[in-house]
A protein has these predicted regions:
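Structural signal for conserved beta-strand scaffold positions within catalytic alpha/beta enzyme cores
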Residues: 22, 68, 172-174, 223-225, ...
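A charged, well-structured terminal subsegment
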Residues: 185, 251, 262-268
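FNR/FR-type flavoprotein reductase catalytic core
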Residues: 85-228
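Ferredoxin-reductase
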Residues: 5-97
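Short, charged beta-turn/beta-strand-edge "cap" motif at the junction between a beta-strand
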Residues: 54-58, 103-108, 245
């Protein structure tokens, strides 16, 4: 049961003052933040949080994907990159700070239909890798054989390889060849000859376009979209994506209808 620390509810979305219990820089300008609160019990792999910047001049909340979830300790791990003034403020917050958090938001990845003996492919790129960690962990717990291919610009940018390697077979690519396989995730995936029961991906638009094309007709292939947001509740339509099949509706909202969509459903 959620206590009074969750001040408001908007449908399934809650507002809570969560506590910052740990933070560290894990790569240049990329930080790992651990928050504690009762909201954690409601979180699913692939969802995100909308966090208020503790600065009166910053009006919009920042959407940050949930990387790992630990209901037992009521903590969640977020990984974010400093992109501007708001995220720079996050990186300087002292341990014990309280943050106004709205969430958990988004539909997340549906992992309930996979189990023992099945295979899943996880594809991530750059700062799109973090939300896939909990996906890999949960699939592993369900007995799924997990193959992970993640791509980064260079060796210094590689993150979360150790965490993923604990639950999956991991292949890392770098654009410049300074670590792992030289090239892109497509370099590795195009050489694979095995079939997968499900595909989960998150990353830059170019990578997601590749995944959408290659697995366009796969019945269980999913892409998680990154988008700029304003309200985070679907009211402002600032994060709209367009549908391939417009017979019913022309668009969907990343914050409310996503961020996870099936391949072959949206225009990339």
């Amino acid at each position: 049961m959620v206590s009074d620390s969750c001040k408001k509810r908007f449908g399934k979305i809650m507002m809570e003052e969560m506590e910052l219990v740990a933070q560290e820089e894990i790569a240049p300008r990329i930080y790992s933040m651990i928050l504690k609160g009762e909201m954690v019990a409601q979180m699913l792999p692939g969802q995100f949080l909308h966090i208020r910047v503790p600065d009166g001049s910053k009006l919009l909340r920042r959407p940050i994907s949930i990387s790992e979830i630990d209901p037992e300790t009521q903590t969640c791990r977020l990984i974010y990159r400093i992109e501007g003034g708001g995220t720079a403020i996050f990186s300087q917050l002292p341990i014990g700070s309280k943050l106004s958090v709205m969430g958990p938001q988004g539909n997340g990845f549906d992992l309930t239909d996979l189990g023992q003996g099945q295979k899943a492919l996880i594809i991530g790129g750059g700062i799109g890798v973090p939300p896939l960690v909990q996906v890999a962990k949960q699939l592993h717990e369900q007995g799924v054989e997990v193959e992970v291919v993640v791509g980064f610009a260079t060796k210094e940018a590689v993150i979360l390889e150790e965490e993923l390697s604990q639950v999956a077979h991991v292949t890392v690519t770098t654009d410049d060849g300074t670590y792992g396989t030289k090239g892109y995730v497509s370099t590795v995936i195009d050489q694979m000859d095995q079939e997968f029961d499900a595909i989960y991906s998150c990353g830059a638009p170019g990578m997601l376009k590749y995944v959408n094309t290659k697995f366009h007709d796969h019945p269980r292939a999913y892409i998680s979209m990154e988008s700029r947001m304003a309200c985070g509740m679907g009211a402002c339509y600032a994060c709209v994506v367009h549908l391939e099949n417009e017979s019913q509706a022309a668009h969907k909202r990343v914050c409310e209808d996503g961020p996870v969509f099936g391949t072959g459903t949206i225009v990339m």
